[in-house]
C-alpha cells in the first residue's frame, strides 16, 4: 500500500557504543536525524549523571555567546549567516573554544566598563558646560535693573531698611526635564517660598552612560540665604537625583572653567571615538563567526544531553543506549555508526542490535514540503496510532475540495491562488530571510494548502458560475425568452405582471443544460436563491455521505493490516450496511429523482423528505402520495430491517464472542515454570522455551479481560455510531450554509460599494471610482478572503477531524521525535 498511506515501520534497537567513540557516533546520528533515544536513567537526578560537567561547560559557553550576541545586536551589526552547517567539534576542542569565548567576553566587558566610565565623565563635563553657559545667562539677567525688584523679594523688609549687605548662596545642577514641575513645588513647600529657582532646558538630548538612551534634561540654579536652606535644598536635589556641580561666582572664573571644560570634552570625545572603533572591530569580528559558534556549542550540548540518557556497563568501557528508529533506515544508521567510529579513531566497532518488545512504537510519517502542511493538519487533532491508516494523503484532496464547496467564487479563488503561487515561487528567498512574523510564518508553512484551496475554489466558482457575485456568460445562456412572446405572454400580462416566469415546456425556451456549471440566466432570476439552496443542500448531503462511507471503507484496511477479522465481521460490515441502507439509499434517491423527472413531469415529482420519513415509519397508506418507482415499499422495508438488524449485530455479538474466546484461552491456559512455558493444549508440541525476560515482559503487559467494560465500550461505540450517522450527515449541511453566506456577503459588498461607483455618471465618477475600488478591494481581502476564508477553513477542518476520521482513525499514538541537529543549524536555537 505504500509508506505514504501508513506510518513507517519502527523497531527498538540497542546500541553498544565504545566510550571513546560514543561522542562521535551520537554526533553522526544527530546529523542523520533518524533515531529517538530512550532515557535509560529515569530515576537518576539530572545533576548526578555522568556528563553533567560537560553539559555545564557547554551552557557556560552558550551564556557567553548570548552575551556577545546581545552586544552585537545592540551595536546594530548583522550576524553573518552563510547557511553553513559546521561539523561538531571534538571533545578536545572544547578547551580552545572556552578560551576564545572567555577572551572575547573579558575584552568586551573591559571595553564596556571603560566606555561607560568615559561616557559618564563625558556626560558630567557636558552637563557642566551647559551649567556654565546657562548660569552666565542667569547672572546677566540678574544684573538687569528691571529685575532688581524681583530679586529683592528674598530679603525681609526690616533688613532692607537697615541696608545690611547680604550675600545670597546658590547651587547649580542638572535634572531630568519631566521632574522640573514636581521639583519646583517641593522646593516651594519645604523652603516656604524663601528660595529663588531659575531653570532652562538643554536643547540637545544627552545620552545615558548606562542604558544608552537619550534623556532630556534641564539646567537649574537655586538662590537661598543661610546654611539651613542650603542643606534643605541639597537634600531635595539628592532626593530628585539631580546632579549638582560647582559653579564659580565671578564671570572670569566661569569663563576660564568653561574653556578648560571644552578642552577636556574634545579630548574625551577623541578617546570615546577610538574606544567605539575598537569595540566595533571586536564585535564585527565576532559577528562573522557567531552563528557557527552557536551551532557548534549547541550541538555539543545536545550530544552530552543524549549521552546522559545512556547506561554505562560495569566495565566502564561501553555505553548502552536504546533507540526507536525506522526499519527502512537501519542501513544508514549502521553506516553513521561506522563513520563515527572511524572519526573517533576507535578500533572496536559500535553494535546495533534489534530488540523484541511489546511496547507501542512512535508514529513516524515521512513528509516533504508539499505534504508537510497536510500532515500537520492531521497531527493537530491527534497523532495516529502506530501503522494505522494515515489520513493525510486523502486530506490533500478532500480538505481543499470541501473548503472550496463553502468558499466557491472564481474571483476570490484566483486571488487566493495568486497569493499562494507567489509564496511557492519565492519560497527559497523567503526561507533564507528567516522571517520572525508568526502569522506570516504560519501561512507560509501552509502555502501548498492555500494553493490547492485557491485552485479548488476557482473550480467550484466556475461550477457555481460566481465571480465576485456576478455570473460569467461564457457559452451563452441555454434559455431564450423569445418563444414566450409568441403564444404564452399576452400584452395584458406584460402590463400588469412585474415578475414573469419562463416555461421550459414551451418549445425553444430551454435548449438543454449549460455546458459547464450553472446557467448565467439564474443570476437574474427572482427565484435564484430557491434554486441554489435546493441544489447546494442536496449536493452537501451527497458529498457528506460519500465522504463518511469512504471513511468507513478505510477502516477495513486497518482491520486487515492488524489481522483483526473479528472487527471486519462485527464492526465494519454492520457499520457499512447501516450507513448504505439508510443514507446511501438517500443519495440514490436524490440522484434518481434528478434523472427520472424532467421539466414535463416536475409538477408531479414527489417530496423526498416525506418519502424518507415514511420509510422509517413504515407508513405507506397514503395513496395520494405517488411512489418514486415500482417496488419501492418492499425495498425500503427491507433496507430499514437490515439497518435495525445491524444495531444488535454491533452491540451484542462482539462482547459475547470475545468472552467466549477468553474463556477458551483460560481453559487452555499456559503456566510458566522457570524459563519454560508449558501449555495444556491438545498437542504437546505447544510447549516452547522462552527467555525469562520475555516471559516477564509478556506477563506484565497482558491485559485482563473484563466483560463488563467490553459491553459498556461496545454499547457506547454502537450508540455513538448510529446517532453519529444522523448528526454527522446534518453536520455536512454546513457546506450549503457557508456557501450561501459567502455568496450573499459577496453580493452585498458589490451592491453596497462597487455598484455605487459604477453608477456615478458625472465627470468625477472616474476619480471617485478609484477610491471606491480601493475600498472594495480592501473589504474583499479583509472580509471575504481572510475572515470568510478562515471560517471555511475551520469548518472544513472540523468535518475532517470529527465527521470523517471518527469512522476509522484512532489517533492515540505519540510522535516520533528523532535526535536531530536540523533545528540547530536552521537557526531554531530555542527548539
Swiss-Prot record:
Chain segments annotated as transmembrane: 389-407, 410-426, 442-471, 535-554, 573-593, 639-658, 719-743, 765-803
GO MF annotations in UniProt: ATPase binding; proton-transporting ATPase activity, rotational mechanism
Membrane topology: Multi-pass membrane protein
GO cellular component, one term: plasma membrane
Pfam families per UniProt: V_ATPase_I
Residues in compartment: Cytoplasmic: 1-388, 427-441, 555-572, 659-718, 804-831
Keyword annotations from UniProtKB, A to Z: Cytoplasmic vesicle, Hydrogen ion transport, Ion transport, Membrane, Synapse, Transmembrane, Transmembrane helix, Transport
Compartment annotation: Cytoplasmic vesicle, Clathrin-coated vesicle membrane; Cytoplasmic vesicle, Secretory vesicle, Synaptic vesicle membrane; Melanosome
Principal localisation: membrane
Record's function text: Subunit of the V0 complex of vacuolar(H+)-ATPase (V-ATPase), a multisubunit enzyme composed of a peripheral complex (V1) that hydrolyzes ATP and a membrane integral complex (V0) that translocates protons. V-ATPase is responsible for acidifying and maintaining the pH of intracellular compartments and in some cell types, is targeted to the plasma membrane, where it is responsible for acidifying the extracellular environment. Required for assembly and activity of the vacuolar ATPase.
Family label: Belongs to the V-ATPase 116 kDa subunit family.
Quaternary structure and interacting proteins, as annotated: V-ATPase is a heteromultimeric enzyme made up of two complexes: the ATP-hydrolytic V1 complex and the proton translocation V0 complex. The V1 complex consists of three catalytic AB heterodimers that form a heterohexamer, three peripheral stalks each consisting of EG heterodimers, one central rotor including subunits D and F, and the regulatory subunits C and H. The proton translocation complex V0 consists of the proton transport subunit a, a ring of proteolipid subunits c9c'', rotary subunit d, subunits e and f, and two accessory subunits.
Protein name listed in UniProt: V-type proton ATPase 116 kDa subunit a1
Species per Swiss-Prot/TrEMBL record: Xenopus laevis
Amino acid at each position: 500500500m505504500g509508506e505514504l498511506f501508513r506510518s513507517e515501520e519502527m523497531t527498538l534497537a540497542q546500541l553498544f557504543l565504545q566510550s571513546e567513540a560514543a561522542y562521535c557516533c551520537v554526533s553522526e546520528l544527530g546529523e542523520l536525524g533518524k533515531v529517538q533515544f530512550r532515557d535509560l536513567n529515569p530515576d537518576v537526578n539530572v545533576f548526578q549523571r555522568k556528563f553533567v560537567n560537560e553539559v555545564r561547560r557547554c551552557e557556560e559557553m552558550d551564556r557567553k555567546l548570548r552575551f556577545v550576541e546581545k552586544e552585537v545586536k545592540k551595536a546594530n551589526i548583522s550576524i553573518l549567516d552563510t547557511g553553513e552547517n559546521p561539523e561538531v567539534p571534538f571533545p578536545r576542542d572544547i578547551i580552545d573554544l572556552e578560551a576564545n569565548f572567555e577572551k572575547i567576553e573579558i575584552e568586551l566587558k573591559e571595553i564596556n566598563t571603560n566606555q561607560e566610565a568615559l561616557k559618564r565623565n563625558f556626560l558630567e563635563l557636558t552637563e557642566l558646560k551647559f551649567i556654565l553657559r546657562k548660569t552666565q545667562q542667569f547672572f546677566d539677567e540678574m544684573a538687569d535693573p528691571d529685575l532688581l525688584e524681583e530679586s529683592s523679594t528674598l530679603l525681609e523688609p526690616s533688613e532692607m531698611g537697615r541696608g545690611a549687605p547680604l550675600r545670597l548662596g546658590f547651587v547649580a545642577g542638572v535634572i531630568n526635564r519631566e521632574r522640573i514641575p514636581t521639583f519646583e513645588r517641593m522646593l516651594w513647600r519645604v523652603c516656604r517660598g524663601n528660595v529663588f529657582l531659575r531653570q532652562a532646558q538643554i536643547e540637545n538630548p544627552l545620552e545615558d552612560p548606562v542604558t544608552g538612551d537619550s534623556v532630556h534634561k534641564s539646567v537649574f540654579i537655586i538662590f537661598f540665604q543661610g546654611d539651613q536652606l542650603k542643606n534643605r535644598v541639597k537634600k531635595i536635589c539628592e532626593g530628585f537625583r539631580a546632579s549638582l556641580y560647582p559653579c564659580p561666582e565671578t564671570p572670569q572664573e566661569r569663563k576660564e572653567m568653561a574653556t578648560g571644560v571644552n578642552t577636556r570634552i574634545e579630548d574625551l570625545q577623541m578617546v570615546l571615538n577610538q574606544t567605539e572603533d575598537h569595540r566595533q572591530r571586536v564585535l564585527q569580528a565576532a559577528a562573522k563567526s557567531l552563528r557557527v559558534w552557536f551551532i557548534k556549542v549547541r550541538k555539543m550540548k545536545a550530544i552530552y544531553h543524549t549521552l546522559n540518557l545512556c547506561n554505562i556497563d560495569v566495565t566502564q568501557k561501553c555505553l548502552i543506549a536504546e533507540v526507536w528508529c525506522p526499519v527502512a533506515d537501519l542501513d544508514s544508521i549502521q553506516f553513521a555508526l561506522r563513520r563515527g567510529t572511524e572519526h573517533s579513531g576507535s578500533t572496536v566497532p559500535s553494535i546495533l542490535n534489534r530488540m523484541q518488545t511489546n511496547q507501542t512504537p512512535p508514529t513516524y510519517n515521512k513528509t516533504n514540503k508539499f505534504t508537510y502542511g497536510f500532515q500537520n493538519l492531521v497531527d493537530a487533532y491527534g497523532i495516529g496510532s502506530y501503522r494505522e491508516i494515515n489520513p493525510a494523503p486523502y486530506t490533500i484532496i478532500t480538505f481543499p475540495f470541501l473548503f472550496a464547496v463553502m468558499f466557491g467564487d472564481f474571483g476570490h479563488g484566483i486571488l487566493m491562488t495568486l497569493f499562494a503561487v507567489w509564496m511557492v515561487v519565492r519560497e527559497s528567498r523567503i526561507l533564507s530571510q528567516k522571517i520572525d512574523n508568526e502569522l506570516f510564518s504560519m501561512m507560509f508553512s501552509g502555502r501548498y494548502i492555500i494553493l490547492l484551496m485557491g485552485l479548488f475554489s476557482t473550480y467550484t466558482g466556475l461550477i457555481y458560475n460566481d465571480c465576485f457575485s456576478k455570473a460569467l456568460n461564457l457559452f451563452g445562456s441555454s434559455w431564450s425568452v423569445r418563444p414566450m412572446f409568441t403564444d404564452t405572454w399576452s400584452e395584458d400580462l406584460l402590463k400588469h405582471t412585474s415578475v414573469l416566469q419562463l416555461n421550459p415546456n414551451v418549445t425553444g425556451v430551454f435548449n438543454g443544460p449549460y455546458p459547464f456549471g450553472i446557467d448565467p440566466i439564474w443570476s437574474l432570476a427572482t427565484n435564484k436563491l430557491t434554486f441554489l439552496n435546493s441544489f447546494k443542500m442536496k449536493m452537501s448531503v451527497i458529498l457528506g455521505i460519500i465522504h463518511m462511507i469512504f471513511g468507513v471503507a478505510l477502516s477495513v484496511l486497518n482491520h486487515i493490516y492488524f489481522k483483526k477479522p473479528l472487527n471486519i465481521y462485527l464492526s465494519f460490515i454492520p457499520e457499512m450496511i447501516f450507513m448504505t441502507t439508510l443514507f446511501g439509499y438517500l443519495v440514490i434517491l436524490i440522484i434518481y429523482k434528478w434523472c427520472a423527472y424532467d421539466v414535463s413531469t416536475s409538477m408531479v415529482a414527489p417530496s423526498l423528505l416525506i418519502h424518507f420519513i415514511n420509510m422509517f415509519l413504515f407508513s405507506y397508506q397514503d395513496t395520494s402520495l405517488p411512489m418514486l418507482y415500482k417496488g419501492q415499499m418492499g425495498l425500503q422495508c427491507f433496507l430499514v430491517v437490515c439497518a435495525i438488524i445491524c444495531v444488535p449485530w454491533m452491540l451484542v455479538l462482539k462482547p459475547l464472542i470475545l468472552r467466549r474466546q477468553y474463556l477458551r484461552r483460560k481453559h487452555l491456559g499456559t503456566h510458566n515454570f522457570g524459563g519454560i512455558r508449558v501449555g495444556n493444549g491438545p498437542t504437546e508440541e505447544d510447549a516452547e522455551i522462552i527467555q525469562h525476560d520475555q516471559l516477564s515482559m509478556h506477563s506484565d503487559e497482558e491485559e485482563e479481560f473484563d466483560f463488563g467494560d467490553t459491553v459498556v465500550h461496545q454499547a457506547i461505540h454502537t450508540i455513538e455510531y448510529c446517532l453519529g450517522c444522523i448528526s454527522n450527515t446534518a453536520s455536512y449541511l454546513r457546506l450549503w450554509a457557508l456557501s450561501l453566506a459567502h455568496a450573499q456577503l459577496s453580493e452585498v459588498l458589490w451592491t453596497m460599494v462597487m455598484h455605487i461607483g459604477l453608477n456615478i455618471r458625472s465627470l468625477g465618477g472616474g476619480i471617485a471610482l478609484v477610491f471606491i475600488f480601493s475600498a472594495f478591494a480592501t473589504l474583499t481581502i479583509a472580509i471575504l478572503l481572510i475572515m470568510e476564508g478562515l471560517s471555511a477553513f475551520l469548518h472544513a477542518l472540523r468535518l475532517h477531524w470529527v465527521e470523517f476520521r471518527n469512522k476509522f482513525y484512532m489517533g492515540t499514538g505519540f510522535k516520533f521525535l528523532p535526535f536531530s541537529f536540523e533545528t540547530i543549524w536552521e537557526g531554531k536555537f530555542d527548539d
